Amino acid sequence: MKRSLFALALTVAALLTERPARAASCSFDTVTGLSFGNYDVFAASPTLSAGNLAYTCTGGATVTITLSIGSAPSFAPRWLLGPPGAHLQYNLFLDAGHATIWGDGTGVTGLYGPNAPADNATVMVPIFGSIPAGQDVPIGGYSDTITATINF
């Protein structure tokens, strides 16, 4: 009889003991970059594109995501670099209406989040891009490299 009670007491103690907290972790799963295609210097409307990034977190992380400036000296506008000395102004946005520039949350920029995703759930985040119309730039390839940082 004493053995049964002792075993029962250990079981109850084990059930009441706190589990150690699991460290939060997050990572990007995929990033689909933006491709603006051919830019028409005579077009009256901006050239638009969209991409997305996907991330997964565990351990109850609350997430924000920032984007770097890229090649430009500031967020507004960013630059796509082309032939020597040429750049094409563009920007990346948090919303399809292009109201909030996606940056690091300083100045004129916003950032994604905070968001508390479900544990181990993949979250897709859209990225919206726009090249303003009316830029007289030389023919050639233009590109920029942006770093996305997930903070948790």
Task: Identify the role of each PLM range.
Residues 1-4:
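Positively charged n-region of N-terminal signal peptides that target proteins for export
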Residues 85-92, 99:
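Extracellular/luminal ectodomains and secreted, surface-exposed scaffolds of diverse proteins
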Residues 7-15:
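Bacterial N-terminal signal peptides
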Residues 29-30, 101-110:
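Short beta-strand and strand-turn-strand segments in soluble, beta-rich domains
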Residues 22-84, 114-152:
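N-terminal small/polar-rich segments of proteins
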Residues 41, 95-97:
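Residues that form or immediately flank small-molecule/cofactor binding pockets and catalytic motifs
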Residues 18-20:
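N-terminal signal peptide c-region/cleavage motif recognized by signal peptidases
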Residues 68-70, 91-95:
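Predominantly extracellular/luminal cell-surface or secreted proteins
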